[in-house]
């Protein structure tokens, strides 16, 4: 009943497709699909306000609101530290459990960690979109992620990379619903080149956060 109330509240009046039956984690669910038409921002590039997002490790995301000339209008640090602490605690328990049991028995605990990671991604994506909408940003800009093929590495590293990917996907969906475009740029030379396209910057040797261009 709660799910149907949510659909009536959030998706009333939207074009609905026939529900699909799905099996997930040995349970069956109904998936409802809706179609919504929105108009994305058409503001001229020179007049645009953008929300630049840096997805980090210690801090979940740093959002910078800026104009085309590089003027910073606002900055927000998004960090769900308690959620990450719980997730990493679960990973620690998985490592200890794995030493004593088979990998098949560990799978259910690993699935739980992935669900926690996805829930964290949803929270971060919602905060990014909300902040961009507050400043009426026309575009949310992310770093382009090279994530083709199988991801290797430790479980903590895998979860972090998956979280970056999921945040971008979720944020793109939420941003489009708010009429905000999403762009991805290569991170190469972003610290070396000036934001106005004039070329390389000159860094202060004593404080690398200060530069001249």
Question: Where are these predicted regions, by residue range?
Answer:
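Positively charged, helix-rich recognition surfaces that bind polyanionic ligands
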Residues: 28-213
């Amino acid at each position: 009943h709660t799910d149907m109330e949510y659909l009536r509240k959030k998706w009333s009046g939207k074009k609905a497709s026939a529900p699909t039956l799905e099996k997930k984690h040995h349970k069956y669910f109904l998936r409802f699909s809706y179609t919504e038409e929105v108009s994305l921002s058409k503001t001229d590039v020179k007049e645009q306000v953008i929300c630049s997002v840096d997805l980090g490790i210690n801090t979940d995301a740093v959002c910078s609101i800026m104009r085309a000339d590089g003027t910073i209008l606002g900055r927000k640090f998004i960090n769900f530290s308690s959620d990450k602490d719980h997730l990493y605690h679960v990973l620690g328990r998985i490592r200890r459990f794995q030493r004593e049991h088979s990998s098949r028995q560990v799978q259910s605990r690993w699935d739980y960690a992935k669900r926690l990671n996805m829930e964290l991604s949803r929270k971060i994506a919602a905060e990014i979109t909300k902040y961009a909408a507050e400043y009426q940003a026309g575009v949310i800009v992310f770093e382009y992620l090279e994530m083709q093929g199988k991801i290797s590495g430790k479980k903590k590293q895998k979860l972090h990379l998956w979280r970056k990917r999921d945040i971008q996907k979720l944020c793109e969906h939420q941003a489009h619903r708010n009429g905000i475009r999403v762009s991805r740029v290569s991170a190469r030379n972003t610290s070396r080149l000036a934001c106005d396209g004039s070329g390389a910057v000159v860094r202060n040797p004593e404080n690398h956060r200060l530069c001249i261009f």
